[in-house]
């Protein structure tokens, strides 16, 4: 991503619409402007009547422009991935659920950049996943009889973890969803023996389920899709459910392919990430670093979960989707940029932490950060600060972590 370009423009700058054609007469232009202004004013009045604040209206108009720009980019015969990354980094508006689903599939590499290949790729992926389902069908129906000891161990752990996946959500507690989640995780684990199943994989599937189910229920929002009831669920055909499950499987695969050493034996990738995060904190806020060191705070005690589940358990779902918009838009979003986000999250509470005087007080706070009431604006600010830190310190952090002279 072009750093200079990103800093020259505020990362939250609105997308400017195209100018009208040059051959348009001044009279026609004035008439069109008047019509558009009246239309916009009327829409604003309606929004105010509905109880929306002027800030809400402004954000809505900005989001509409972003959606329009994303649609323009994604409708090209050959999609400019750099353009798409730049716009999605700022946050994909939730008003149109189809947009986020489409963008994630492109950014993950599930969809080809060449538009004419899209349908054939989708069908090939679907056929491939159905073949895998057929291979493991008998085992999943009769686990005790068909699976060997190692497979049964994986299956039982998945069965144990899945009911804990958003237990307050009727969507995730639906029996069909539980089976879909089990099948996705079991097939992935058996096809990736280097890591197998690791606790937390069920959490990594949460954003994908929400985004791809919203795609099929565009009239809903993040909160209402989590409350999807049995009658609404039954509206989806088996073919549609297979399509969703296929997309979730390959999305998880694309994500884990980027960070697989996080989940191999002894999880060396996570150990390395935690060490790098510690170096970032030392560089950016040496006073906080020394303060935590004085109390012998081990970063593993509080941020292992941050690395293992990519902050899914630390923030409300809508903020995780916003966070992952940025991660998918970064070339090394999960393996590198995530470290700066985690460090910046810790630095956000620097003064509070330095005011604490007991080890137990510190560790309890670090394991339960007060982020439940954070807003999208708070997440935007966290991402902006994280990016600034990355630009300013990334070279020296990498050199130090590699054991070289700075």
Pin down the residues of each PLM region.
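Extended, Lys/Glu/Leu-rich amphipathic alpha-helical scaffolds
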Residues: 56-65, 230-301, 332-406
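Aromatic-anchored, charged helix-turn/loop surface patch used as a conserved interaction hotspot
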Residues: 116-117, 121-169, 244-302, 306
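Extended serine/threonine-enriched, polar tracts that run as long, contiguous segments within proteins
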Residues: 312-318, 328
């Amino acid at each position: 991503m072009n750093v200079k370009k990103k800093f020259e423009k505020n990362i939250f700058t609105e997308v400017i619409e195209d100018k009208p054609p040059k051959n348009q007469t001044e009279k026609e232009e004035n008439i069109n402007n008047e019509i558009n202004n009246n239309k916009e004013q009327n829409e604003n009045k309606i929004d105010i009547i509905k109880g929306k604040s002027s800030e809400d209206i402004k954000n809505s108009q900005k989001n509409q422009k972003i959606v329009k720009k994303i649609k323009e980019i994604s409708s090209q015969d050959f999609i400019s991935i750099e353009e798409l990354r730049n716009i999605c980094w700022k946050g994909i508006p939730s008003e149109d659920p189809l947009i986020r689903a489409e963008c994630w599939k492109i950014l993950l590499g599930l969809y080809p950049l060449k538009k004419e290949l899209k349908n054939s790729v989708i069908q090939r992926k679907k056929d491939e996943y159905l073949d895998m389902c057929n291979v493991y069908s008998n085992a999943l129906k009769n686990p005790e009889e068909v699976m060997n000891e190692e497979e049964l161990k994986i299956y039982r752990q998945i069965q144990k973890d899945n009911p804990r996946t958003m237990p307050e959500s009727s969507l995730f507690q639906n029996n069909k969803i539980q089976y879909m989640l089990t099948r996705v995780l079991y097939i992935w684990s058996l096809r990736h023996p280097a890591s197998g199943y690791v606790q937390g994989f069920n959490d990594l599937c949460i954003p994908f389920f929400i985004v791809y189910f919203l795609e099929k229920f565009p009239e809903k929002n993040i909160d209402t899709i989590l409350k999807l009831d049995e009658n609404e669920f039954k509206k989806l055909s088996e073919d549609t459910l297979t399509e969703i499950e296929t997309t979730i499987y390959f999305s998880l695969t694309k994500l884990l392919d980027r960070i697989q050493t996080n989940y191999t034996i002894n999880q060396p990738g996570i150990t390395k990430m935690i060490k790098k995060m510690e170096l970032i904190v030392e560089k950016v806020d040496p006073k906080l670093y020394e303060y935590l060191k004085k109390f012998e705070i081990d970063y593993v005690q509080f941020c292992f979960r941050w690395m293992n589940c990519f902050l899914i358990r630390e923030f409300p779902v809508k903020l995780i989707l916003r966070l992952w918009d940025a991660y998918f838009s970064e070339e090394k979003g999960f393996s590198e940029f995530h470290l700066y986000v985690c460090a910046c999250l810790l630095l956000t509470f620097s003064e509070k932490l330095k005011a604490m005087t007991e080890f137990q007080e510190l560790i309890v706070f670090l394991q339960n950060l007060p982020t439940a009431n954070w807003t999208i604006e708070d997440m935007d600010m966290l991402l902006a600060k994280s990016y600034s830190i990355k630009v300013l310190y990334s070279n020296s952090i990498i050199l130090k972590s590699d054991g070289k002279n700075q």
